[in-house]
Amino acid sequence: MPPIYRYDHMHLRSRDVKKTAEYYQQMFDAEIVESIQSDGRPRTDLDLNGLTIFIAPVPPEAATPPAPAEPYVGLDHFGLCVDDMDEAVAELKRRGASFTLEPRIIRPGVRIAFVQAPDNVRIELLERGRI
């Protein structure tokens, strides 16, 4: 029998872990949990409705490349399902979110929008089946 693979976590890196964690808490009501990495250094974890996100610090002196220009290869974004796109977008805008793509229908039954999060992370909001 082949192995079974399940999603476990997403791991982000940030120059300002506290600010990044607070963003996810403010925008998406994520719970912030202080943690320790396997190497003993501090890490901040988030619980976003069962989605685990680790945020590890990038030292201020570390050189980091700029965000890639499109097209590029690698992780593009992560997606969050919402029951009501209009309600979610209105609430996120009220909380100060910046949208790179306003809600639009991409095919029958699927509507998307994109939020720009700290550290060049793009978050897709998806509403399925209401349209």
Task: Please state what every model-predicted region is.
Residues 1-6, 31-79, 90-116, 129-131:
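Vicinal oxygen chelate
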Residues 15, 128:
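Cofactor-binding loop segments of dinucleotide-utilizing enzymes, especially the Rossmann-like FAD-
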Residues 20-25, 92, 120:
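Conserved active-site tyrosine of GNAT-family acetyltransferases
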Residues 125:
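Short glycine-/small-residue motifs
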